[in-house]
Amino acid sequence: MKVSVVVCTYSMERYESFSETVESVLAQTYEPLELVIVVDGNEEEFDRVQDDFGDIDDVVLHCNDENRGISYSRTKGAELGTGDVVAMIDDDATAEPDWIETLVDTYENNPDAVAVGGTVVPDWVARKPEFFPEEFYWLVGCDERGFGEHMEEVRNTYGSNISFKRDVFLEVGGYDTNTGRKGDKHVQAHEAPVCIRIYEQTGERVIYNKQARVNHKLFEYRTEFDWLVFRSFWQGYSKRVMDLLYPQASDDKNAYLKDLMLVYVVDRLKNLVEDPSLAQVQQLIAIFVFTAAVGFGYVYGLLTPNLVEKTNN
């Protein structure tokens, strides 16, 4: 089973991190494997990529003619790849050496599997802020508290650790370009739509193998309270876009909100009474602030006319 790993990048500012991502893929224990690098419209970066990685076997390079966003770029990478499976990883993450081997084992042990994902663990470049609750790690693309059980079928895992049978992925059209980061647009949640379409076509969800591990770098700006509130707002906006495009996705969102308020917040309140600390108070406050920001973003989406058209332009 050949695997194509797609890495998309767009900025020289993250080139060092991107290079570490590439090296972690090239160091995988599994073969046969090819690496597909898609540079999203940055000619300067593409020249550097060609110099650094262009002469390595089983590395495919491509530069988009302009910045087209993460959804287009990842789909393009899958089209350029030749593997039976296509795996995605962010350009600010590093994979454990057995990442691909673990994903492939899951496919081989589950003949009906069409998508397999793994754990995305925070790699704190700066110190982890005490106020940041694990329930909201999803804001930074990492597995949050209660995300899923080992080998459970889930709607989707996060974009830095997800793989698909390549033919199925392309058959459903790949990622929806109405979603996902593009330039200065902040629409998130591009993983869910393709997984929903795959489920509707095949009846199969994503198998979550917690042993397939990717470490996601969290730079200092991603740990700032204001940035996380901003991110929460745009996540709420993105959820409104998702409701319009894929109303069937709302069940997972509602289940998460129910668990957050009725299970995790209650559990935190009990712990606060039994063993009070400043960090626990800060995290409780953050939960309510982030939740409110998500709500405001959703309402902003409700009030935005022609929302989907504006998102795609």
Curated annotation (Swiss-Prot):
GO process annotations (BP): S-layer organization
KW Transferase (keyword) present: yes
Disrupted gene: phenotype observed: Mutants contain only hexose-modified phosphodolichols and exhibit defective or limited motility.
Protein name: Glucosyl-dolichyl phosphate glucuronosyltransferase
Pfam families in the cross-refs: Glycos_transf_2 (PF00535)
Coiled-coil region: none
The EC number(s) this enzyme carries: 2.4.1.356
GO molecular function, one term: glycosyltransferase activity
Lineage: Archaea, Methanobacteriati, Methanobacteriota, Stenosarchaea group, Halobacteria
InterPro entries: GDP_glucuronosyltransferase (IPR053553), Glyco_trans_2-like (IPR001173), Glycosyltransf_2 (IPR050834), Nucleotide-diphossugar_trans (IPR029044)
Residue spans crossing the bilayer: 284-304
Subcellular localization, as worded in the UniProt entry: Cell membrane
Topology relative to the membrane: Single-pass membrane protein
Protein family: Belongs to the glycosyltransferase 2 family.
UniProtKB keywords: Cell membrane, Glycosyltransferase, Membrane, Transferase, Transmembrane, Transmembrane helix
Record flagged with keyword Transmembrane: yes
Species of provenance: Haloferax volcanii (strain ATCC 29605 / DSM 3757 / JCM 8879 / NBRC 14742 / NCIMB 2012 / VKM B-1768 / DS2) (Halobacterium volcanii)
